Design a protein with these regions (language model features):
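Hydrophobic anchor at the start of a short beta-strand
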Residues: 46-48, 83-85, 138
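Short, conserved glycine- and acidic-residue-centered signature motifs
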Residues: 29, 65, 123-127
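Gly/Ser-rich helix-loop-strand patches that form or flank binding pockets
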Residues: 1-5, 107-146
Length: 146
């Protein structure tokens, strides 16, 4: 059976919500944003929640001060998507899962890293925890790293 693959934007019934865990790495944040922006979806039907978890959050810190969050937001807004940013203190995996529940996310988008051959067996601890503790689809993106 021949199947035709189309790159026409998929029309969604209502909003499609992504929760994106953004760490401190700019290239990974941009890779995550590019991956979402390049999906064949109607941009005006996509909502993206960018989440950065502060370790030991300091008083007065805001998520908008985090450069990877700003870069991802700019790229997604250029693509015409609705973007929100949230910051939380504490455990990143737990924050991602809680925000996904709060917003009834359709999909989670996390950053992956290149690893040694032994390290490739396991994802990073945050990514692994999220994958194991959610029933939502999880997309793991990686930046081109040298």
């Amino acid at each position: 059976m021949d199947e035709t693959v189309t790159s026409e934007p998929r029309v969604l019934d209502g909003m499609y919500t992504f929760v994106v865990g953004i760490d401190a790495d700019e290239s990974r944040a941009l890779a995550q944003a590019e991956t979402i922006a390049d999906m064949p979806l109607e941009a005006d039907a996509v909502r993206v929640i960018l989440l950065h978890s502060f370790e030991g959050k300091t008083k007065g810190s805001t998520v908008e001060q985090v450069k990877p969050v700003r870069l991802a937001r700019e790229r997604l807004e250029e693509a015409g998507m609705t973007v929100e940013a949230e910051g939380y203190g504490g455990d990143a995996a737990r924050a991602i899962l809680n925000v996904a529940d709060d917003h009834d996310a359709d999909q989670l988008v996390l950053a992956g890293r290149k690893r040694t051959p032994t390290g490739k067996v396991l994802f990073g601890s945050v990514t692994q925890s999220v994958i194991l503790d959610t029933e939502r689809p999880v997309l793991v993106c990686s930046a081109d790293e040298e």
